[in-house]
Amino acid sequence: MSHTVKIYDTCIGCTQCVRACPTDVLEMVPWDGCKSGQIASSPRVEDCVGCKRCETACPTDFLSVRVYLGRLETTRSLGLAY
C-alpha cells in the first residue's frame, strides 16, 4: 500500500531520512535551495509502508519529510483532529 510522502523546502539535505527508510522510497536530488545543494525526493512512494522512520530521523524542527497515511493522518498532522 502506498502512502503520500511530502518533502518540504525546510529540508537541509542531511540524508538522514534517506538512510532511515527501509524500503528505499527516498533519494537525494540536486537543489539550490540549501547549503548542501540537495533535497530529499520520493520517487518510489508505491513502496512506502508507512513506518515513518523518515519523519523520526529528520533533524529539522519542521519535519521536512512527512508521511500521510490517509485522511485521519492528514488532519491529525495539521492539528485539526484534537
UniProtKB/Swiss-Prot annotation:
Tagged with keyword Glycoprotein: no
The gene name reads: psaC
Q: What does this protein do?
A: Apoprotein for the two 4Fe-4S centers FA and FB of photosystem I (PSI); essential for photochemical activity. FB is the terminal electron acceptor of PSI, donating electrons to ferredoxin. The C-terminus interacts with PsaA/B/D and helps assemble the protein into the PSI complex. Required for binding of PsaD and PsaE to PSI. PSI is a plastocyanin/cytochrome c6-ferredoxin oxidoreductase, converting photonic excitation into a charge separation, which transfers an electron from the donor P700 chlorophyll pair to the spectroscopically characterized acceptors A0, A1, FX, FA and FB in turn.
Residues of the 4Fe-4S ferredoxin-type domain: 2-31, 37-68
Subunit structure of this chain's protein: The eukaryotic PSI reaction center is composed of at least 11 subunits.
Upper lineage is:
Eukaryota, Sar, Stramenopiles, Ochrophyta, Bacillariophyta
Q: Which GO terms describe its molecular function?
A: 4 iron, 4 sulfur cluster binding; electron transfer activity; metal ion binding; oxidoreductase activity
Listed binding positions for [4Fe-4S] cluster 2 are C21, C48, C51, C54
HAMAP family under this entry? PSI_PsaC (MF_01303)
> What is the name listed in the Swiss-Prot or TrEMBL entry for this protein?
Photosystem I iron-sulfur center
Query: Where on this chain does [4Fe-4S] cluster 1 bind?
Result: C11, C14, C17, C58
Q: Which PROSITE patterns match?
A: 4FE4S_FER_1, 4FE4S_FER_2
